[in-house]
């Protein structure tokens, strides 16, 4: 009996160790020599594809700095693999270990914090409305009876419905499978408006065939922290990520990176997003934190 109990105890310890290892991304990377970065194909200047399996963007580059610091910590180069994620599957893929660090356009909110952890915020977004310039739409009230596009798995339409100015406004929701698809709904006339993060709207407009045909209008629906996502219960990786972004802010590298991606011409069309750092983003740099969107709403 004692031997049986001892065997069970050993198995329990082994299982606990395996669980800890699964959530220790740095140890996992050291053992395997591989780290998998979750990427997006059309998340505005934060993260997008260049084609041929290549990705780039503001959050993509921040993640590259974090990965470089993992390599320094473990003393060897890593094979960085890229996993394309969507708004629907990004959280499950981080949870199940397919993706080690997700570098896209994910809102840090209280619900998601139950499932994943976020690196301290370095980009704060304003959710806005994009329309065709000749639509005559300038406010939420004018969306009554209209079709409004958003991307499956995002929170934007819920924010629109919760806005006090939307009381009594009845609109139809249409969904794109990704942000580019949602913008296409607007561009093709299948939607009268596209509700999404301002930089995603601005980025899609800047690369449209005729950017002047579109504009961003109306009230700011919400202010949301957009952050890099990792697995829960991984304090070593959380600290390394937070330390990395803190060093980038302190050195001025973060501000330079922001200017590069939001104020200068960027690939693939050499177009400029033209979105200066908001006061909320500057405040996040001045006081780095991982507070959820709900805390921003209280202000």
Predicted features, each with a name:
Residues 36-45, 55-72, 107, 124-179, ...:
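Bilobed "Venus flytrap"/periplasmic-binding protein-like clamshell domains
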Residues 41, 123-131, 206-245, 264-287:
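Periplasmic-binding protein-like
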Residues 61-69, 141, 146-147, 152-154, ...:
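Extended ligand-binding regions for polar small-molecule ligands
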Residues 75-142, 283-291:
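Acidic, polar ligand-binding/catalytic clefts
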Residues 158-174, 212-214, 246-299:
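Ligand-binding clefts/hinges and TM-proximal coupling segments of bilobed small-molecule sensing domains
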Residues 22-102:
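Extracytoplasmic small-molecule ligand-binding "clamshell" domains
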Residues 74-86, 169-178, 218:
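Short beta-strand-to-loop elements that line the ligand-binding cleft
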Residues 89, 104-114, 159-166, 185-188, ...:
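A ligand-binding cleft/hinge motif common to bilobed small-molecule-binding domains
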């Amino acid at each position: 009996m004692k031997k049986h109990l001892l065997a069970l105890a050993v198995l329990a310890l082994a299982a606990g160790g395996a669980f800890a290892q699964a959530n220790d991304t740095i140890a996992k990377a050291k053992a395997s020599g591989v780290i998998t970065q979750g990427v997006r194909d059309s998340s505005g200047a934060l993260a997008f594809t260049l084609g041929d399996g290549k990705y780039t963007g503001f959050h993509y580059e921040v993640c590259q700095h974090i990965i470089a610091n993992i390599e320094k910590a473990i003393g060897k180069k890593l094979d960085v693999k890229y996993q394309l994620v969507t708004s629907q599957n990004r959280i499950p893929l981080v949870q199940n270990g397919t993706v080690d660090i997700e570098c896209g356009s994910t809102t840090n909110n209280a619900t998601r914090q139950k499932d994943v952890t976020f690196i301290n915020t370095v980009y704060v977004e304003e959710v806005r409305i994009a329309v065709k310039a000749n639509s005559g739409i300038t406010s939420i009230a004018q969306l009554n009876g209209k079709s409004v596009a958003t991307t499956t798995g995002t929170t934007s339409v819920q924010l629109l419905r919760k806005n006090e100015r939307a009381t009594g406004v009845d609109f139809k929701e249409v969904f794109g499978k990704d942000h580019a698809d949602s913008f296409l709904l607007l561009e093709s006339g299948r939607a009268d408006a596209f509700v999404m993060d301002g930089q995603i709207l601005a980025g899609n407009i800047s690369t449209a065939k005729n950017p002047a045909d579109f504009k961003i209008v109306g009230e700011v629906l919400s202010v949301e922290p957009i952050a890099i996502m990792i697995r829960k219960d991984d304090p070593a990786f959380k600290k390394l990520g937070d330390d990395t972004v803190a060093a980038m802010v302190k050195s001025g590298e973060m501000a330079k990176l922001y200017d590069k991606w939001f104020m200068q011409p960027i690939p693939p069309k050499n177009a400029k997003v033209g979105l200066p750092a908001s006061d909320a983003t500057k405040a996040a740099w001045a006081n780095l934190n991982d507070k959820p969107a709900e805390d921003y709403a209280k202000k």
